Amino acid sequence: MIPYKQLSLADIFSDCHEKFENDKPAFLSLLETHIDIDELIPISFRNHFYASTGRTRKYPLQAFLWALIIHRIFSIPTDQLLLTFLAYSKSLREFCGFIKVPDASKITRFKQDFLDDLQLVFDNLVDVTEPICQAIDSAKADMTIFDSSGIEAFVTENNPKYANRIIKQLKAYAKAQGFDKSYDPYKAAYGSMPSHASANPEIKQLYINGHFCYVFKFGIVTNGLGIIRHISFYNKNFMASHPDIVVEKKSDSPDEDKCVHDSKLLIPTLKDFFSKHPLINPKTFLGDAAFDTAQLYKSLLTGDTFGNDKHFSKAYIPLNARSGLENLDYSINEDGIPCCPHDPSLQMKYEGTSKLRSGVTRYKFVCPRMKWIYDKSTQKSHRHCFCDNPCTSSKCGRMVYIYPEKDLRAYPGTIRGTEKWDDTYKIRTVVERDINHIKDNLCLAGRRTQNERTLHADLILAGITQLITVVLADKINHHEYIRSIKPLIA
């Protein structure tokens, strides 16, 4: 006889609950287990959102934040498609905390009304993730890398036909006038195009990745791991808070304009970064040739630029091809290494770095024809120059001592052209990959709006999403996912 077992209501509920938990997507369970969004929301944000004045909130703050983070983690291109996913996925809707799916206008108003609060969430996450970055790789976490780009706005001037029409007209004009090959229709087009979009003067013309576009310009500071540390949005508010920035009229060279503008934005951007995060104190700066100016080296490497005796120790910046280095006694190559007085193509050998009693650092370079000779009688080695046309009477050959503090541009705390320089400077590309990542994978590109606050919020949310990724990767002990957790979704 088969024994009869009566099912209780508790058993049925337990089975249903277990089935519900097992059917929940694994990635959402991972986020739910390891990320406490409440800990990351400043109390000021909560007070602002749930203010005593106005209507009662139908949708909770955490629900909006989770929805916008999921939006970017899953690379959902539009807000409307996100709402469609929420409508058809009960597990996603319940994970975010929505009882009912909000309208698209609610998402837009949330971004615009709470932009400053989203910035506070981002700044909080920067401080949370700094110890994680230090634990993963302290050398790379000690680096600061800066680059700028732009968010293309949804305006007429960004239609490819707009620029192509002007270029086509200029090519036809050049052909009719019989101009020679030195005439560049692309530079001429840049000069003839308006400096800002007709719909909004804050949408500026910029030359990015080989094409003209009209954008809201922004700057990003990352560390050597490629983790975002700071975001600056270069709008009227930024310019008003930094009146020392002088905006000049554009020239006929788009590349030159971008270099000049970036060099003026660097120090104000870094000052904002260090004022928000005084405990972060990196010692190495990496930047492209746009920052190769004597004044920038002085600001980066000396004084109280970023606080009381707070500055970088090294700056990895390649020399700009338009301006070289000069010395009356001997020539200096493009890497800042002294060359033989009789043969400028022969660079001297770097022999080491030493410090004087006064604490001043100096680099030592010796004749490239010099060799160490071992004397068996004294059991010691000594230098000997084997040059056929010596530039000095010394048997050791010519020696040159370089004092970096006298010429920070030539010797910014490190030696160009060395293996260490090459290996370190390669790391700079992480900021470019980061910009491409937040545009393509975190859905910053292709936004069909020209509203400044909406696009600014989208930029901040992209930064928040990346830092949430860092926290999650650390919680599950998979640091290889600090920049992207797409493998976990699959």
Q: What are these model-derived regions, one by one?
A:
Residues D423-A490:
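Basic, amphipathic alpha-helical segments enriched in Lys/Arg and hydrophobic/aromatic residues
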Residues M1-F45, I476-A490:
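Charged, often Cys/His-bearing segments associated with DNA-binding zinc-finger transcription factors
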Residues D255-E256, D262-D375:
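An internal, acidic/charged active-site-proximal segment
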Residues A26-F74:
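Basic, short loop/linker segments at the boundary and entry of helix-turn-helix/winged-helix-like folds
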Residues D113-F285, A289, A294-T302, F306-F312:
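Polybasic low-complexity intrinsically disordered regions
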Residues Q80-F95:
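DNA-recognition alpha helix
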Residues C96-D113:
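Major-groove recognition helix of helix-turn-helix-like DNA-binding domains
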Residues I35, L86-A87, G150, D329-V366, ...:
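Short amphipathic alpha-helical "interface-anchor" segments enriched in bulky aromatics
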